[in-house]
């Protein structure tokens, strides 16, 4: 089944794009003792099927905006003590949940959300394992105790409505 999400002019144009895992941690990297594992989000465990995920989300009050064979679209989703206006949950070739992206945007350059979430992640996971800042993009990557990952990105993106907005994107994956 497929229920297309309604058009929202401020969604990033790539919110339906493919989900990809960052490069693995460097060979010498080891998680610090006690670092949390990254094994899911919103109470969903990586590997869960899309049907089970939809039931869970509907039954727990999440606003499901649409879904397809390999993605679920959500609105106004809590993550890391913030509300994210849009989120996409991604399901791999085997049908299991393997990643998510949470989006927050402003019409102007504003690093407030990025900096606050960055500081939260540093407090929990330590300094990022990888940082790639350049060409108008800030990108930091952390790994959990099980090599699950978190990325935090800030950049300007085209929106579905054709305008350019500044997005903070928080992604979790397996």
Please place each PLM-identified region on the residue numbering.
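N-terminal secretory targeting and juxtamembrane "stalk" segments of secreted and cell-surface proteins
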Residues: 23-25
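Non-cytosolic coordination micro-motifs
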Residues: 1-21, 30-67, 104-174
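Active-site beta-strand termini and strand-to-loop segments that position acidic
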Residues: 75-77, 92, 141-147
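Mid-chain, structured segments of secreted extracytoplasmic proteins
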Residues: 77-111
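Hydrophobic residues embedded in beta-strands of well-ordered beta-sheets
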Residues: 70-72, 96-98, 138
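Well-ordered beta-strand positions enriched in small/hydrophobic/aromatic, beta-favoring residues
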Residues: 72, 100, 168-170
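Accessory recognition modules or surfaces
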Residues: 33-36, 40, 46-47, 68-91
């Amino acid at each position: 089944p497929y229920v297309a999400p309604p058009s929202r002019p401020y969604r990033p144009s790539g919110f339906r794009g493919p989900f990809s895992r960052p490069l693995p941690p460097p060979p010498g990297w080891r998680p610090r003792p006690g670092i949390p594992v990254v094994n899911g989000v919103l109470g969903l465990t990586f590997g869960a099927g899309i049907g089970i995920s939809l039931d869970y989300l509907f039954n727990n009050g999440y606003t499901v905006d649409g879904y397809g064979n390999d993605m679920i679209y959500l609105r106004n989703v809590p993550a890391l003590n913030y509300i994210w206006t849009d989120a996409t949950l991604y399901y791999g070739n085997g049908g299991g949940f393997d990643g998510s992206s949470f989006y927050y945007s402003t019409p102007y350059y504003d690093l407030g959300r990025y900096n606050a979430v960055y500081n939260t992640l540093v407090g929990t996971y330590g300094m990022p394992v990888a940082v790639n800042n350049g060409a108008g993009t800030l990108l930091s990557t952390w790994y959990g105790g099980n090599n699950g990952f978190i990325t935090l990105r800030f950049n300007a993106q085209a929106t579905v409505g054709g305008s350019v907005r500044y997005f903070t994107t928080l992604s979790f994956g397996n």
